[in-house]
């Protein structure tokens, strides 16, 4: 294949599953002979929500929740002909979102 840079972004709420998926992708790419950089941990996005516990009164009693979105970045610098085939045949867990840009 020609010189083509592929960027893979992984997102998920559980950092352990995200790291396992990134390791699985890196191992599959190394088997094909592709040159990669990463996985690079990107900043975690934290969304915080405050909910009033009582239904009618007592604003002083609130409960806080947060959602943490963890992100990883993998760059494929040099690809081979088997690289894209290896990426399409991967089985990733349900809690991981993957974005591939060419």
From Swiss-Prot:
Gene Ontology, cellular component aspect: ribonucleoprotein complex; ribosome
Keyword tags: Ribonucleoprotein, Ribosomal protein
Domain of life: Bacteria
GO biological process: translation
Entry keyword Hydrolase: no
Statement: the UniProt record of this protein carries the keyword Iron: no
Molecular function, one GO term: tRNA binding
Function: Involved in the binding of tRNA to the ribosomes.
PANTHER family xref list: 30S RIBOSOMAL PROTEIN S10 FAMILY MEMBER
Subunit structure: Part of the 30S ribosomal subunit.
Homology family: Belongs to the universal ribosomal protein uS10 family.
Protein name: Small ribosomal subunit protein uS10
Native organism taxonomy: Bacteria, Bacillati, Chloroflexota, Dehalococcoidia, Dehalococcoidales
Name of the gene: rpsJ
């Amino acid at each position: 294949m020609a010189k083509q840079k592929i960027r893979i972004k992984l997102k998920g709420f559980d950092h352990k599953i995200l790291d396992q998926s990134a390791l699985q992708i890196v191992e599959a790419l190394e088997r094909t002979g592709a040159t990669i950089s990463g996985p690079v941990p990107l900043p975690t996005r934290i969304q915080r929500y405050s909910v009033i516990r009582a239904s009618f009164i007592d604003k002083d009693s609130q409960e806080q929740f947060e959602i943490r979105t963890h992100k990883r970045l993998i760059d494929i610098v040099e690809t081979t002909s088997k690289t894209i085939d290896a990426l399409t045949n991967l089985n990733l867990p349900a809690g991981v979102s993957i974005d591939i840009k060419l």
